[in-house]
């Protein structure tokens, strides 16, 4: 019986990255032997055990055989006869198919160390094409390790394209697709995830609303990058630089879906694209089971981002209506989220990545002024029922007007 550290822990240690999860493989053991040593079995489909003290996972060495469609269409065989090499062979990428024994000795039968040194994401074997989930996983690894200089091997990208064309991506559950998207959004370079899916023809299948943006032109005056798909990638990249909030990053990703619906005769103009995109966002979110808080923020950003860009030109009453629509009185955290998504949109343009975005500060100042208006003096003044709400609205508009007046005085020579 031999114990090995495997997978991400070995990979991340070789990359000098923080090791978060430590997974182990056991060769030459039976489930009964593991139980006798105090391990607790948790795996149903194949034997996985939890260490009695550390709680870390220990899986018996196993092989897999394709028996059906999708990432769940596999039968597993675990026995003391399965070798280290056989277990590592079933893994997705060579960088994830390295093992380390208890003495620190590395076992690398498929060249994972060389691929780490050369910054290459490469499949372990031709069985790679049997699991459609690997398209999403490799795209996510490409996003996660983009800053370390990793790229996908051409032959691996070709296999990912083969999977896309096989029809097996449709077998992925909505929950699994969103889980991979959410993990990708949390990486340093989430735009790479979308780019890779587009490269291997998976984007059109999994996220057709986003795929439809590529090739759609925009006015060069406002968008030197021209292509709406490229703009979307740039906005997502900026959102990742601005904050760690995945709901903001998702809103950035889908803020311009409506541009795909602009009539060809009107291109490159996109009148009302923010509102046109609302239905598309709802469809995408329903299909992939996006959480409600992600969806609601995305809808607000799509609807309001053009107004926020021109916020200094808006009347005070219009601004208060925006605060109402966004329900900022009850959900003030949305103020920062909307501001960040709009800033990402403004900076996600060729040559404008370092531009300032004063609209965000003005947006926040106006809301904070309006939010300071107290209801108590209005009630004490004798107003009742609907009059209270009307007076509160008027006072909020006055507070915003004062901020606007101060801004105008500051801007005047």
Curated annotation (Swiss-Prot):
It holds the Pfam family HD. Mg(2+) binds at residues 21, 23. Residues 228-329 form the HD domain. GO terms for molecular function: ATP binding; CCA tRNA nucleotidyltransferase activity; cyclic-nucleotide phosphodiesterase activity; magnesium ion binding; phosphatase activity; tRNA binding. Its cofactor is Mg(2+); Ni(2+). It catalyses: a tRNA precursor + 2 CTP + ATP = a tRNA with a 3' CCA end + 3 diphosphate; a tRNA with a 3' CCA end + 2 CTP + ATP = a tRNA with a 3' CCACCA end + 3 diphosphate. CTP binds at residues 8, 11, 91, 137, 140. The keyword Transferase applies. Keywords: ATP-binding, Hydrolase, Magnesium, Metal-binding, Multifunctional enzyme, Nickel, Nucleotide-binding, Nucleotidyltransferase, RNA repair, RNA-binding, Transferase, tRNA processing. CDD domains: HDc (cd00077), NT_ClassII-CCAase (cd05398). SUPFAM superfamilies: Nucleotidyltransferase (SSF81301), Poly A polymerase C-terminal region-like (SSF81891). It comes from the Bacteria. Gene3D superfamilies: Beta Polymerase, domain 2, cca-adding enzyme, domain 2. One of its GO terms (biological process) is RNA repair. ATP binds at residues 8, 11, 91, 137, 140. Monomer. Can also form homodimers and oligomers. Belongs to the tRNA nucleotidyltransferase/poly(A) polymerase family. Bacterial CCA-adding enzyme type 1 subfamily. PANTHER family: MULTIFUNCTIONAL CCA PROTEIN. Catalyzes the addition and repair of the essential 3'-terminal CCA sequence in tRNAs without using a nucleic acid template. Adds these three nucleotides in the order of C, C, and A to the tRNA nucleotide-73, using CTP and ATP as substrates and producing inorganic pyrophosphate. tRNA 3'-terminal CCA addition is required both for tRNA processing and repair. Also involved in tRNA surveillance by mediating tandem CCA addition to generate a CCACCA at the 3' terminus of unstable tRNAs. While stable tRNAs receive only 3'-terminal CCA, unstable tRNAs are marked with CCACCA and rapidly degraded. Comprises two domains: an N-terminal domain containing the nucleotidyltransferase activity and a C-terminal HD domain associated with both phosphodiesterase and phosphatase activities. HAMAP family: CCA_bact_type1 (MF_01261), CCA_bact_type2 (MF_01262). A single active site specifically recognizes both ATP and CTP and is responsible for their addition. This is Multifunctional CCA protein. The lineage of its organism: Bacteria, Pseudomonadati, Pseudomonadota, Gammaproteobacteria, Alteromonadales. The gene is cca.
């Amino acid at each position: 019986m031999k114990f090995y550290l495997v997978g991400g822990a070995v990979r991340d240690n070789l990359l000098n990255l923080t090791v978060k999860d430590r997974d182990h493989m056991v060769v030459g053991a039976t489930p009964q032997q593991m139980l006798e040593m105090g391990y607790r079995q948790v795996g149903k489909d194949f034997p996985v055990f939890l260490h009695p003290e550390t709680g870390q996972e220990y899986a018996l060495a196993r092989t897999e055989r394709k028996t059906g469609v999708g990432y769940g269409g596999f039968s597993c065989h675990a026995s003391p006869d399965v070798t280290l090499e056989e277990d590592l062979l079933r893994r997705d990428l060579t960088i994830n198919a390295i093992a380390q024994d208890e003495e620190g000795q590395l076992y690398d039968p498929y060249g994972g160390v060389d691929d780490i040194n050369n910054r290459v994401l490469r499949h372990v074997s031709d069985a790679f094409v049997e699991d459609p989930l690997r398209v999403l996983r490799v795209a996510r690894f490409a996003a996660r390790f983009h800053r370390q200089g990793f790229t996908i091997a051409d032959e691996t990208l070709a296999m990912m394209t083969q999977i896309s064309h096989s029809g097996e991506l449709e077998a992925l559950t909505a929950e699994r697709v969103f889980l991979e998207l959410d993990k990708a959004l949390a990486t340093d370079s989430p735009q790479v995830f979308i780019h890779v899916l587009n490269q291997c023809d998976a984007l059109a299948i999994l996220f057709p609303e986003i795929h439809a943006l590529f090739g759609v032109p925009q006015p060069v005056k406002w968008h030197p990058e021209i292509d709406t798909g490229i703009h979307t990638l740039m906005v997502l990249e900026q959102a990742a630089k601005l904050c760690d909030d995945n709901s903001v990053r998702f809103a950035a990703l889908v803020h311009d879906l409506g541009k795909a619906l602009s009539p060809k005769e009107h291109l490159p103009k996109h009148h009302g694209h923010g509102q046109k995109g609302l239905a598309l966002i709802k469809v995408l979110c329903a299909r992939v089971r996006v959480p409600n808080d992600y969806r609601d923020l995305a809808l607000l950003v799509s609807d309001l981002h053009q107004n926020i860009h021109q916020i200094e030109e808006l009347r005070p009453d219009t601004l208060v209506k925006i605060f109402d629509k966004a329900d900022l009185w009850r959900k003030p955290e949305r103020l920062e989220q909307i501001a960040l998504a709009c800033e990402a949109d403004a900076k996600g343009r060729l040559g404008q990545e370092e531009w300032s975005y004063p609209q965000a500060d003005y947006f926040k100042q106006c809301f904070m002024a309006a939010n300071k208006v107290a209801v108590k003096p209005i009630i004490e003044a004798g107003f009742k029922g609907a009059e209270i709400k009307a007076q509160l609205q008027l006072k909020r508009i006055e507070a915003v007007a004062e901020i606007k007046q101060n801004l105008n005085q500051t801007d005047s020579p």
